[in-house]
Swiss-Prot record:
Belongs to the complex I subunit 6 family. It comes from the Bacteria. GO terms for molecular function: NADH dehydrogenase (ubiquinone) activity; quinone binding. This is NADH-quinone oxidoreductase subunit 10. NDH-1 is composed of 15 different subunits, Nqo1 to Nqo15. The complex has a L-shaped structure, with the hydrophobic arm (subunits Nqo7, Nqo8 and Nqo10 to Nqo14) embedded in the membrane and the hydrophilic peripheral arm (subunits Nqo1 to Nqo6, Nqo9 and Nqo15) protruding into the bacterial cytoplasm. The hydrophilic domain contains all the redox centers. It comes from Thermus thermophilus (strain ATCC 27634 / DSM 579 / HB8). It is a multi-pass membrane protein. The chain crosses the membrane at residues 2-22, 26-46, 56-76, 91-111, 137-157. NDH-1 shuttles electrons from NADH, via FMN and iron-sulfur (Fe-S) centers, to quinones in the respiratory chain. The immediate electron acceptor for the enzyme in this species is menaquinone. Couples the redox reaction to proton translocation (for every two electrons transferred, four hydrogen ions are translocated across the cytoplasmic membrane), and thus conserves the redox energy in a proton gradient required for the synthesis of ATP.
Length: 176
């Protein structure tokens, strides 16, 4: 392992640990951006320039902006209702995370995950049939998980707004 590979590995592991352990969500999102940028550098070093650019544009750009948007929604809800709306759901979230990790471990157990196909530098012509062929389920599962996480975050914020709007309407009717 060369010095640059070791540095990239260290930065990937460090930023990954920071994403999970930092208490400030904005700092965790910044650590996630660092992780994505280092991973993009690894892709470029492996001569997969297209994947590196997509990593920066899609993940470090769009996905992190989406995460920050959801984080801001949750912080807005926390300020409006006076408490953290996620406190009661943390044990359930931990249980679900352990369940998903168990399912993933059971599914990956005994699989030969050696990737032997030549991706021709990460060109879209080589990636397209692979993503929409052999790895279609994985691609759809990742998309579904991202969508579900966003919907749940918005759903945590919306009930408070809807009930306040109904209360305001009732007050107006009573005042008439």
């Amino acid at each position: 392992m060369s010095l640059l590979e070791g540095l990239a590995l260290f930065l990937l592991l460090l930023s990954g640990v920071l994403v999970v352990t930092l208490r400030n969500a904005i700092h965790a999102a910044l650590a996630l951006i660092l992780n994505f940028l280092v991973l993009a550098g690894v892709y470029v070093a492996l001569d997969a320039r297209f994947l590196g650019f997509i990593q920066v544009i899609v993940y470090a750009g769009a996905i992190v902006v989406l995460f920050l948007f959801v984080i801001m929604l949750l912080f807005a809800a926390q300020g409006e209702i006076g408490f953290d709306p996620l406190v009661r759901s943390r044990p359930l979230a931990a249980l679900l995370a352990l369940g998903v990790a168990g399912i993933l471990a059971a599914g990956l157990w005994g699989l030969d995950l050696a990737f032997t196909q030549d991706l021709k530098g990460g060109l879209p012509q080589a990636l397209g049939p692979l993503l929409y062929g052999d790895w279609l389920f994985v691609l759809l599962a990742v998309g579904f998980l991202l969508m579900a996480a966003t919907v749940v975050a918005v759903a945590l914020v919306e009930p408070g707004k809807a009930s306040r709007a109904k209360e305001a309407e009732k007050r107006e009717e009573v005042a008439r």
